[in-house]
Swiss-Prot record:
Keyword Chaperone applies: no
Annotated compartments: Cell inner membrane
Keywords from the named record: ATP synthesis, ATP-binding, Cell inner membrane, Cell membrane, CF(1), Hydrogen ion transport, Ion transport, Membrane, Nucleotide-binding, Translocase, Transport
Top-tier EC class: translocase
Reactions the enzyme catalyzes: ATP + H2O + 4 H(+)(in) = ADP + phosphate + 5 H(+)(out)
Name of the protein described by the UniProt record: ATP synthase subunit beta
Topology term for the membrane: Peripheral membrane protein
Domain of life per record: Bacteria
Organism for this UniProt entry: Vibrio cholerae serotype O1 (strain ATCC 39315 / El Tor Inaba N16961)
One Pfam family per UniProt: ATP-synt_ab_N
Name of the coding gene: atpD
Main localisation: membrane
Subunit comment: F-type ATPases have 2 components, CF(1) - the catalytic core - and CF(0) - the membrane proton channel. CF(1) has five subunits: alpha(3), beta(3), gamma(1), delta(1), epsilon(1). CF(0) has three main subunits: a(1), b(2) and c(9-12). The alpha and beta chains form an alternating ring which encloses part of the gamma chain. CF(1) is attached to CF(0) by a central stalk formed by the gamma and epsilon chains, while a peripheral stalk is formed by the delta and b chains.
Amino acid sequence: MATGKIVQIIGAVVDVEFPQSEVPSVYDALNVVDSKERLVLEVQQQLGGGVIRAIVMGSSDGLRRGMTVQNTGAPISVPVGTKTLGRIMNVLGDAIDERGDIGAEEVYSIHRPAPSYEEQSSATELLETGVKVIDLICPFAKGGKIGLFGGAGVGKTVNMMELINNIALQHSGLSVFAGVGERTREGNDFYHEMQEAGVVNVEQPELSKVAMVYGQMNEPPGNRLRVALTGLTMAEKFRDEGRDVLLFIDNIYRYTLAGTEVSALLGRMPSAVGYQPTLAEEMGVLQERITSTKKGSITSVQAVYVPADDLTDPSPATTFAHLDATVVLNRNIAAMGLYPAIDPLDSTSRQLDPLVVGQEHYDVARGVQATLQRYKELKDIIAILGMDELSEADKQVVARARKIERFLTQPYHVAEVFTGDPGVYVPLKETLRGFKGLLAGDYDDIPEQAFMYCGTIDDAIENAKKL
């Protein structure tokens, strides 16, 4: 294959000069021949005169002008199939768990076209999560795309871990976890939790049910920009074999941020708030591939960091358009000590439709939202004049809304370590029974503190007896 020479290095971006007749294509992978460790560059632009501009998939420390670079003639390819299960890989598909080579029979390019319109399928089957507020207000669809939106420290990763615990462990299919620019500690904890749960089997990797791909916070932007595509490529292989796959991505915002870091170095003019001008396109390329086909389904859960709690920031705003369900975490709810801090008035789902969830579920969910919305409107009056100035009907609304707020809390399995309360999985019909009774006034005589951190309504009645 053609060889070239490095002519310029600007941080994570490198210019390489090739003979005019052998210029590599965009997205081709190039190997740095003289590097001690395997170092791959990915072509991003052809600058003319035989010079291309590429992103480094790794650290550019030790690179110098004049080094020889070889074109592989193909995009970055990663191992796919059952050999990836139970293993931790990096953006290039190399094992980083110190357990030897992956040894997969097949490799796929990380740049693939999205399935055509004819191949795609839409499903309305619901995916029960066991989390009351999600199952009631923003139900998930099997094969749907779900976003967990929240600022720093409101609980995105904990909620995602609980969903992995409740869905992946109950679900007999396979999962792929892509850690994009998140904390290495969390990735390490996740791996050990999966081992304890039996989802990762170190002795017999073929019995494992999850493949893990990491490009964490400390890695160069090239790795963080492409690691989501690596994880997605592995999930696509399982889907095309006719399986139902769960794809967890933590965190989509870091994918955008890596694009921003690289974009300026590539010489593109920044757009709104300093983001790359290709923000919508980059997001679309990733999201359009996360879809279900007639062969199999990919259900994806994506954590989305919201900078400065501003949902109108271009990055979260661009992500919104692609999702079927949005779970919005609210700092004010977290500040009141109500966890999970999911905002029932801000979270949405396309599945919350009487034709999909049924009339009863729809009515209960809308009733809960109406009660909470009315309470929100009355809060100003209460703050100025106090509760005594409210009508009897409004006092009743406030009392029920406060009980609903508390009943939306729930102890999590993954938080058991630091709360001491055993986690609870609440079936959908129990969730509906509880909230239907609350709206009808069946539990008006139970004090509100009995509803804190309980599972079903029966637990709340038991708590009331102890008060």
